[in-house]
C-alpha cells in the first residue's frame, strides 16, 4: 500500500451544525495531518458549512533525505528551478477531484465548495482548481506556490474555473516558501484567471505558519462566497 492514496486515513471533518449546503476541503502541508486544520476551522465555522481536512498518504520525501512522512506528492527542492514530481502532483489532484465528487454525491454542488490548503496543500489546491472541470466557488491558498507552472498557457485558462475567486495569503518573514514565491504566483494567477477575483494578503512578521488575522480573513472569504441558502 506504500504511496497508495487508499492507505490514507479518513479525513478530519467539522460537520455542519445543521444541513450542510456548502463545504470547504482544506489540504495540510508537508509532514502534517488534517487534525490541526480541522481544529482551526472549528474555531471559525459557519453552521451550514462542512469542513473537510483530509490526511495525505505517507511517502518518502526527497527534500527530507527520503524520510517517509505525510505528503501529497514528492518535493525535490524549494528553489524556483527545482525539479517537480509531475506524475505525483497529477495523481494527487485526481485524489482531490474524487473528494469533490464525493461531496457532490452527498448533495453539495461543486460551485458551493471552496478548495484550500497550506504550503504543499495550498499548491495542490491551486493546481487542482486550475485543471479540474468541476466548477468551484473559490480557493484559499496559504503560504504556497503554483506547481507545474510551465504546464499552463500564457493566456487565460480554458476551464470551468477561469472566473474563480482566489484568496492568497503569505507571511512576509516566511523562511521556507519566501514571500517572492507568493507574489510571483499571484501574478501568474492574474494571467490565468479573472484578475479582479484574485486577492493577495501579506501578514507582517508571519513566518511559515498561520495567524489569527489570516484565519479571520479566510473566514470572511468563505462566508462571503458560501452564504446560507435556506
Curated annotation (Swiss-Prot):
EC number: 3.1.2.-, 3.1.2.22
Keywords: Acetylation, Cell membrane, Cytoplasm, Endoplasmic reticulum, Fatty acid metabolism, Hydrolase, Lipid metabolism, Membrane, Nucleus
Example GO BP: negative regulation of aggrephagy
The organism's place on the tree of life at top rank: Eukaryota
GO function terms (MF aspect): lysophospholipase activity; palmitoyl-(protein) hydrolase activity; phospholipase activity
N6-acetyllysine modifications at: 224
One Pfam family hit: Abhydrolase_2
Impact reported for residue 174 to A: Abolishes lysophospholipase activity
Catalytic activity entry: S-hexadecanoyl-L-cysteinyl-[protein] + H2O = L-cysteinyl-[protein] + hexadecanoate + H(+); 1-hexadecanoyl-sn-glycero-3-phosphocholine + H2O = sn-glycerol 3-phosphocholine + hexadecanoate + H(+); a 1-(9Z-octadecenoyl)-2-acyl-sn-glycero-3-phosphocholine + H2O = a 2-acyl-sn-glycero-3-phosphocholine + (9Z)-octadecenoate + H(+)
SUPFAM superfamilies attached to this UniProt entry: alpha/beta-Hydrolases (SSF53474)
Compartments reported by the entry: Cytoplasm; Cell membrane; Nucleus membrane; Endoplasmic reticulum
One annotated Gene Ontology cellular component of this protein: mitochondrion
Record: active site: 119 (charge relay system), 174 (charge relay system), 208 (charge relay system)
Family: Belongs to the AB hydrolase superfamily. AB hydrolase 2 family.
Its biological purpose: Acts as an acyl-protein thioesterase. Hydrolyzes fatty acids from S-acylated cysteine residues in proteins such as trimeric G alpha proteins or HRAS. Acts as a palmitoyl thioesterase that catalyzes depalmitoylation of proteins, such as ADRB2, KCNMA1 and SQSTM1. Acts as a negative regulator of autophagy by mediating palmitoylation of SQSTM1, decreasing affinity between SQSTM1 and ATG8 proteins and recruitment of ubiquitinated cargo proteins to autophagosomes. Acts as a lysophospholipase and hydrolyzes lysophosphatidylcholine (lyso-PC).
Protein name, UniProt field: Acyl-protein thioesterase 1
Amino acid at each position: 500500500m506504500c504511496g497508495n492514496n487508499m492507505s490514507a486515513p479518513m479525513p478530519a471533518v467539522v460537520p455542519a451544525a445543521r444541513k450542510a449546503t456548502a463545504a470547504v476541503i482544506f489540504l495540510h502541508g508537508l509532514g502534517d495531518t488534517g487534525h490541526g486544520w480541522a481544529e482551526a476551522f472549528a474555531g471559525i465555522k459557519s453552521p451550514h458549512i462542512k469542513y473537510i481536512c483530509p490526511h495525505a498518504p505517507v511517502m518518502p520525501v526527497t527534500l527530507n533525505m527520503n524520510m517517509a512522512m505525510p505528503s501529497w506528492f514528492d518535493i525535490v527542492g524549494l528553489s524556483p528551478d527545482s525539479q517537480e514530481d509531475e506524475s505525483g502532483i497529477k495523481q494527487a489532484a485526481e485524489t482531490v477531484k474524487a473528494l469533490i465528487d464525493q461531496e457532490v454525491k452527498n448533495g453539495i454542488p461543486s460551485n458551493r465548495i471552496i478548495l484550500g490548503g497550506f504550503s504543499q496543500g495550498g499548491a495542490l489546491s491551486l493546481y487542482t482548481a486550475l485543471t479540474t472541470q468541476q466548477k468551484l466557488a473559490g480557493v484559499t491558498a496559504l503560504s504556497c506556490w503554483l506547481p507545474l507552472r510551465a504546464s499552463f498557457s500564457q493566456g487565460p485558462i480554458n476551464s470551468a474555473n477561469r472566473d474563480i475567486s482566489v484568496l492568497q495569503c503569505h507571511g512576509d518573514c516566511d523562511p521556507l516558501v519566501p514571500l517572492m514565491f507568493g507574489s510571483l504566483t499571484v501574478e501568474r494567477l492574474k494571467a490565468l484567471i479573472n484578475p479582479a477575483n484574485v486577492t493577495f494578503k501579506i501578514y507582517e512578521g508571519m513566518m511559515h505558519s498561520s495567524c489569527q488575522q489570516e484565519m479571520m480573513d479566510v473566514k470572511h472569504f468563505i462566508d462571503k462566497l458560501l452564504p446560507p441558502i435556506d
